Design a protein with these regions (language model features):
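Alpha-helical transmembrane segments of multi-pass membrane proteins
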Residues: 37-40, 105-117, 171, 175
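Selected alpha-helical membrane-embedding segments in polytopic membrane proteins
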Residues: 2-104
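Terminal transmembrane helical module of multi-pass membrane proteins
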Residues: 124-187
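C-terminal halves and exits of single transmembrane alpha-helices
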Residues: 82-83, 109-127, 185-187
């Protein structure tokens, strides 16, 4: 099955941005239609999310996996929809509201690469290819790389300073943790 051109272009653009190549922005569509279509990235990243679920917190012997799957899937959808809503007034405060759609388009497609990178690092750790002493460090470095990637995207798409980009990354992190902790409390 062939990947639709707009998806392939967006993922290629996200890859180029991960390499800190601003030219990656040229591969993203713009406008309201592209904004709504960028949420297809949530469906593409969902299998990686599902693979990461058993690695999260939980009591292995008594876990009701159907309940966990339902709660975590709802949390996943909330995460994909809450961040754009929270960031809209932030872009307004920063005087960059006109770039909000473009930012969310790029942010959404970048999530596919982020899930893939975290999944790959965890796979290497679980496979035993990395010495035990490095396993936690690899994951820590992967998360730092994800934060830097998101900051780079915020900086170049919204044309803002590094501190403002860092604030957006922090908002994303705090919102994500809030949603995760809430979901975990409902298992």
């Amino acid at each position: 099955m062939a990947i639709p051109a707009d998806i392939a272009n967006a993922l290629y653009g996200a890859w180029r941005l991960a390499r800190l190549d601003r030219g990656g922005l040229a591969f993203f569509d713009h406008g309201e239609t592209a904004f709504w279509r960028s949420f297809r990235a949530a469906f593409i990243a969902y299998p990686a999310f599902l693979l990461l679920l058993p690695l999260g917190p939980g009591d292995s012997g008594t876990t009701d996996w159907v309940r966990v799957l339902l709660v975590e899937t709802i949390a996943y959808v909330i995460g994909w929809t809450a961040f754009p809503l929270v960031i809209l007034p932030v872009t307004r405060i920063l005087g960059r509201e006109s770039l909000w759609l473009d930012f969310i388009i790029v942010y959404n497609w970048s999530q596919v690469l982020q899930y893939g990178a975290i999944l790959a690092i965890i796979a290497v750790s679980l496979s035993g290819l990395a010495p035990p002493v490095l396993q936690g460090g690899l994951l820590y470095l992967a998360y730092l790389a994800v934060f830097a990637y998101e900051g780079f995207i915020a900086r170049i798409v919204l044309n803002i300073s590094w501190p403002a980009a860092g604030m957006i990354v922090l908002i994303d992190f705090v919102l994500g943790r809030l949603i995760s902790v809430t979901a975990e409390s409902l298992h």
